[in-house]
Amino acid sequence: MKFIPALIIFVFTIFALTNSETTYSGFKITSADPKNPCSISVPQTDVGTKCIDVCGQGNINIAAVSGETNKYDINGYQATDQCKNSAGQQTLTCGTPVTVGVFSIDCAPDAGATTAAVTTAATTAAVTTAATTAAVTTASTTAAFTTTGTSSTIVIPFALILSLLLSVITL
């Protein structure tokens, strides 16, 4: 019985971590070229903007996929000729980085939203655990009273009968 509250907390914590909602606030673009290391953050408000310059090494165009949530088409362009020469296109699903040209691109989560979701779930788990603990305690107390009551009901008549028998034998 002592392990039940701990087990409930564990289950709810796992549930909170796996079901927390993550809001993606932008994109992190990192150069995969060891000779030219570079990493920039692009806000989600720049989605649809053509030719986002990545440290002078190339350009990226990010476009939302119609009807999809957290899914984007990423076009990589060469740095010259006003971004007309495409170096390839990939569809990016948030949480799974893609490589376009020499760039690795991933969605950047909004840590605040994730933390808030986890905190809320953890609080709910704590309240549920407290309620469960209270219920278990109440049930235990009720059981104790019931046992005591039953015990009294059996012991008292038996004592009276024994007393009467002894008095009869004595007479």
UniProtKB/Swiss-Prot annotation:
Primary residence: membrane
Membrane topology value: Lipid-anchor; GPI-anchor
Name recorded for this polypeptide: Ponticulin-like protein F
Propeptide stretches in the record: 150-171
Protein's UniProt keywords contain Signal: yes
GO CC term (a single one): side of membrane
Lipid-substituted positions (GPI-like-anchor amidated glycine): 149
Subcellular location: Cell membrane
Endpoints of the signal sequence: 1-20
Annotated keywords: Cell membrane, Glycoprotein, GPI-anchor, Lipoprotein, Membrane, Signal
Transmembrane segments: none
Mod. after translation: The GPI-like-anchor contains a phosphoceramide group, rather than a phosphatidyl group.
Family per similarity comment: Belongs to the ponticulin family.
